Amino acid sequence: MPTKPPYPREAYIVTIEKGKPGQTVTWYQLRADHPKPDSLISEHPTAQEAMDAKKRYEDPDKE
């Protein structure tokens, strides 16, 4: 199991398209560079959920 990254943590949101061409659905991935570069942290169906997850991930008080 990966170790917890030290603070300050930084994450970024990547928009991806899932599904067959012409029938895609947009998903939002939360990614960080711990434990490896471009590690997938979580996936979310809305941009707002991804932003909320990013805030929680980066907030040391949410530990």
Curated annotation (Swiss-Prot):
Pfam families reported for this sequence: YaiA (PF16362)
Domain of life of the native organism: Bacteria
Gene giving rise to this polypeptide: yaiA
InterPro entries found in the cross-reference section: YaiA, YaiA-like_sf
Name of this protein: Uncharacterized protein YaiA
Span list, region Disordered: 35-63
Feature: compositional bias, Basic and acidic residues: 51-63
Gene3D superfamilies, sorted: YaiA protein
